[in-house]
Amino acid sequence: MYRVFDKLASRPFVSLPGIQLIAKMPLSDLNKLPPLADQLEQAKRIAAYRAVDENFDAKTHKVVGVGSGTTVVYVAERLGEYMDEKTNFVCIPTGFQSKQLILSNKLQLGVIEQFPEVDIAFDGADEVDAGLQLIKGGGACLFQEKLVSTSAKKFIVVADSRKKSPKYLGTNWKKGVPIEVVPSSYVRVLSDLKNKLNCKSAMVRQGGSAKAGPVVTDNCNFIIDADFGEITDPRKLHQDIKLLVGVVETGLFIDNAEKAYFGYPDGSVDLQEL
C-alpha cells in the first residue's frame, strides 16, 4: 500500500496498488435491476441501493464506514458504482469480511485509527425497534461496528423486512443480545448475567462444525448471547451489562441510527427515521 493525498478533504489515505480506476458508468437503474434467484437477496439489494443513493454524496462524504453482514454486501456493491477517476473517498471496515467487501469492489481502504471521524456509515442489523434502537452482533463484529457507527456523523441501517420489530427488541430476534467479553472473564460474566440481571439464558457462542470451541472475534474476544426476552428499556439494559467486569461491548446500539431502510421481496422499501 502507499499513501496519496486527498486535496478536497486535506487528509491522507491508503490507496491500493494494482487498482486502476476507470471512467464512471451510469448507476444501475433501480427499476431495471436484473432479478436475483433468491427473493430475500432482492429485498436486501434494493434496501442497500436505496440507502446509498439517498444518503451518500461523493462530493462531501470522504470517509465512509462499511459494516458487516449479508445486506452490506450490496452497500459495497453500490458504492463501487460511484468510484471513478474523479471520485475520492475512503472506506473504513468493521471487520475482516467488511475489508474483503471493500477490496473486492475496488474501493479505497482505510482504517479507523487513521480516520477517527467518519462522514457516513452504512451497516446492517439483527433487529430494529420502533425507536431505531438496534440489536447487532450476529456476525460477531459488534465492537468494531459500534466503533465505526458512533464515529460517524450519519449512521444508516440497511436490512430486509424480517429485521423490523413491531415494538420491542427481542420480539423477532430470538438469539439474544450479543455481548463481547474478555475470554478469561466469560464464566464470571455468565454468572452475573443470570444472578444480577435476571437473564433467561446465556451461553458462549460456539464456532460450529468448522471450529472446535468458541467463536473468537477480530479482537480475540468471546461472544456471549444473552436472552432477556422482549427488551422494554434497551438503554438501561445496555448500561447494566457494560458495568459487568469483563464486558467489552454490547450488541445494543442506542441512539445511534438516523435512518433504517427495510427491503421487501416485491421490490418495495420501507424507510424508518426519527
UniProtKB/Swiss-Prot annotation:
Record EC number: 5.3.1.6
InterPro entries: NagB/RpiA_transferase-like (IPR037171), Ribose5P_isomerase_type_A (IPR004788)
Catalysis: reaction(s): aldehydo-D-ribose 5-phosphate = D-ribulose 5-phosphate
Subcellular compartments: Cytoplasm
An annotated GO BP: D-ribose metabolic process
GO cellular component terms listed in the entry, alphabetical order: cytoplasm
GO molecular function: ribose-5-phosphate isomerase activity
Entry-linked SUPFAM superfamilies: D-ribose-5-phosphate isomerase (RpiA), lid domain, NagB/RpiA/CoA transferase-like
Family named by the database record: Belongs to the ribose 5-phosphate isomerase family.
NCBIfam families per record: PRK00702.1, rpiA
Protein name stated in the entry: Ribose-5-phosphate isomerase
Biological source species: Kluyveromyces lactis (strain ATCC 8585 / CBS 2359 / DSM 70799 / NBRC 1267 / NRRL Y-1140 / WM37) (Yeast)
Lineage start: Eukaryota, Fungi, Dikarya, Ascomycota, Saccharomycotina
